[in-house]
């Protein structure tokens, strides 16, 4: 009888241990980018570090100390590839759930270690130069992942950037402006992504195809012609721009499909590998896709693209 009770106690203990450890493995780990020394920061009491990811949305008043949420791939699946994810939200907020944590878990299923970037949203009240604030955070994020690659079992030459909507603008900015010195780096680690995944991205700041909310939030109401050109990333593609996988829908009323088309054409001009999937429907902001629409097939197309570039091969 005593042995039976003992076995029951052991079973109960193991059950609770599985719950505790299971939860700990499924949760992400936060990595602060700047350790309290954010470049070009202006203190403002109205901006508090009060991120609530339960709602799936983060507003611009909630991020003053940007960070990465790390989602390591399991040892059984890990292939050494990593992706830094930039959620969208018109540079006014961030859809951190369906363009962040849900995407990270999908990447984990592919054996990819994912990092959701909670970047600062541009605002003159907390930044000396709001146009480069998100880029500072993005460059820093890639350098951190590359510097700590061994710790996470990552190949430092297999680190990609991924962005949705305005997060796609940040991702394409990091793909074209990675050599731009927007802060004083601690070392010579490259901030260049090895590949990019751009989903219904804002690419251009040009009047005829930009998303006006994203442009105004990043550059203000009256940007100069030089600023518009500088942050129109289809104009900044060069021979060092990393390969890209892109997705857009023809009926996107928020961000015109021409954003992706122009970027893909610029990539083609420089003979850089680029795959663009244009769907007849889907609109905007669908994350991994809506089950009834054809755009829901993009994750599988992306998987095949990653596979074709040997980014899913276990070593």
What residue ranges belong to the model's regions?
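Bacterial Sec-dependent N-terminal signal peptides
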Residues: 1-30
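C-terminal catalytic histidine-bearing segment of alpha/beta-hydrolase fold enzymes
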Residues: 257, 261-315
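Primarily recognizes the serine-hydrolase "nucleophile elbow" in alpha/beta-hydrolase
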Residues: 140-210, 228
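Mobile cap/lid helix-loop segments that gate and shape the active-site cleft of serine hydrolases
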Residues: 50-55, 201-236, 242
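Short beta-strand element of the alpha/beta-hydrolase
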Residues: 79-88
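N-terminal cap/lid segment of alpha/beta-hydrolase-fold proteins
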Residues: 27-77
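Catalytic nucleophile-loop/oxyanion-hole region of alpha/beta-hydrolase
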Residues: 94-96, 101-103, 119-156, 292-295
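Short beta-strand/loop motif that positions the catalytic acidic residue
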Residues: 246-248, 252
């Amino acid at each position: 009888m005593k042995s039976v009770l003992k076995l029951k106690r052991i079973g109960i203990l193991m059950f609770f241990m599985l719950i505790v450890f299971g939860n700990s493995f499924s949760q992400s780990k936060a990595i602060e980018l700047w350790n309290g020394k954010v470049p070009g920061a202006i203190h403002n009491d109205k901006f508090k570090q009060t991120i609530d990811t339960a709602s799936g949305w983060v507003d611009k008043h909630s991020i003053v100390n940007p960070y990465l949420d790390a989602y390591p791939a399991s040892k059984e699946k890990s292939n050494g590839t990593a992706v830094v994810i930039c959620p969208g939200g018109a540079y006014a907020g961030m859809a951190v759930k369906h363009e962040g944590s849900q995407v990270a878990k999908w990447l984990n299923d592919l054996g990819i270690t994912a990092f959701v970037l909670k970047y600062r949203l541009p605002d003159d009240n907390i930044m000396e130069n709001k146009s480069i604030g998100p880029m500072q955070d993005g460059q820093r994020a890639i350098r951190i992942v590359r510097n700590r690659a061994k710790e996470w079992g990552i190949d430092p030459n297999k680190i990609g950037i991924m962005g949705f909507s305005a997060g796609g603008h940040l991702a394409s900015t990091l793909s074209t402006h990675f050599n731009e010195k927007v802060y004083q780096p601690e070392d010579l680690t490259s901030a260049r992504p090895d590949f990019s995944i751009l989903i219904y991205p804002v690419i251009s700041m040009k009047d005829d195809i930009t998303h006006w909310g994203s442009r105004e939030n990043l550059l203000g109401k009256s940007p100069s012609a030089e600023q518009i050109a500088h942050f129109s990333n289809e104009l900044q593609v060069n021979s060092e721009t990393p390969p890209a996988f892109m997705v857009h829908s023809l009926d996107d009323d928020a961000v015109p499909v021409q954003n992706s088309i122009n970027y893909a054409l610029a990539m083609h001009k420089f003979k850089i590998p680029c795959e663009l999937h244009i769907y007849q429907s889907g609109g905007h902001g669908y994350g991994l896709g809506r089950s009834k629409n054809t755009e829901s097939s993009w994750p599988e197309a992306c998987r095949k693209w990653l596979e074709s570039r040997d980014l899913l091969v276990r070593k």
